[in-house]
């Protein structure tokens, strides 16, 4: 089958790789976002799917339109005469003119109708869900509202970060893509139940701002959801780069203070529960072990961790 693949991050790359390796499929075009400046030096960097294709599939044509709502984009994709358009975290909503070209199947990284939108994996971790998953869905003009074709789910491990969960779900999505295509004609699509629907928005850098006035369990969920980006940080700019939950329910009077110091790090009191902080990163500096940080700041038990 002739496939146009539309995807941008590493999550999509694993699906693209599986399609390229399947002898029954012919990926004729990769559509991805434009190269973007990254990091402090603003180095122009290609999307993960493009970087992979350039190294492993140099003959695959790559198309990077700024927008899809124009005649050029529609003509480019239409010329491929695709049997299917596979979409995975592409980054733009597909207009009706493209949806009409071929069946468009989206591999959305949630168990729909939960977490429609831009940050399903982070939202799964923020809610401390026990399970995560991928839904294959026949696309329509609404945001992740199409009829569902199949699911794949897995248990979320207690210390999974969004990076680790992305990796696990990308493997699940790759397998689900191949199964959906293989059985497409026999599948019985079913509608989403709108009453069970939740939305999730795009993650912003400021979402990583945290306070010891929050529950330890909440901070732990934010740490898992926002690792590696944007990370979590205090109002002082101190980034908490490695931590673990010590106590989720204890009430504390000295909120934000160092309760004790161990070889592994420092235990800090939250409004409810406590966290073990092992590594931190001061603003404009490299990450370091927290013991080196408190030594330099001359902090000890009872002092505020700022």
Where on the chain are the PLM-derived regions?
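N-terminal Rossmann-like dinucleotide-binding module
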Residues: 1-40
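Internal alpha/beta domain cores that form substrate/cofactor-binding pockets in large enzymes
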Residues: 4, 28-31, 61-80, 85, ...
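Structural motif corresponding to alpha-helix initiation and N-cap regions
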Residues: 13, 46, 70-74, 118
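Donor/substrate-binding cores of folate-linked one-carbon enzymes
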Residues: 25, 84-200
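N-terminal beta-loop-helix "entrance" segment that forms/cooperates
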Residues: 36-54
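Internal anion-binding site segments
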Residues: 195-306
């Amino acid at each position: 089958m002739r496939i146009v693949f539309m995807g941008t991050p590493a999550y999509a790359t694993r699906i693209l790789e599986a399609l390229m390796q399947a002898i029954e499929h012919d990926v004729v075009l990769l559509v991805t976002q434009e190269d973007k400046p990254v990091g402090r030096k603003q180095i122009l960097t290609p999307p993960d799917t493009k970087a992979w294709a350039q190294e492993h599939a140099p003959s695959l044509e790559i198309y990077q339109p700024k927008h899809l709502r124009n005649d050029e984009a529609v003509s480019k994709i239409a010329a491929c005469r695709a049997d299917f358009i596979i979409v995975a975290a592409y980054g733009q909503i597909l207009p009706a003119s493209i949806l009409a070209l071929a069946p468009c199947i989206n591999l959305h990284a949630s168990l729909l109708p939960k977490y429609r939108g831009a940050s399903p994996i982070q939202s799964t971790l923020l809610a401390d869900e026990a399970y995560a998953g991928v839904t294959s869905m026949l696309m329509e003009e609404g945001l992740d509202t199409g009829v569902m074709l199949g699911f794949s789910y897995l248990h979320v491990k207690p210390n999974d970060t969004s990076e680790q969960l992305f990796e696990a779900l990308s493997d699940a999505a790759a397998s689900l893509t191949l199964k959906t295509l293989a059985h497409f004609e026999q599948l019985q699509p079913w509608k989403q139940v709108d009453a069970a629907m939740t939305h999730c928005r795009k993650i912003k850098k400021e979402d990583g701002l945290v306070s010891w006035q929050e529950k330890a369990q909440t901070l732990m969920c934010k740490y898992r959801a926002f690792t590696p980006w944007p990370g979590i940080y205090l109002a002082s700019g101190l980034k908490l780069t490695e931590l673990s939950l010590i106590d989720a329910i204890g009430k504390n009077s000295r909120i934000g203070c160092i309760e004790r110091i161990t070889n592994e790090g420092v235990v800090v009191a939250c409004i409810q529960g406590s966290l073990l902080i092992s590594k931190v990163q001061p603003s404009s500096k490299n990450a370091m072990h927290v013991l080196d940080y408190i030594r330099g700041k001359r902090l000890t038990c009872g002092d505020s961790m700022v």
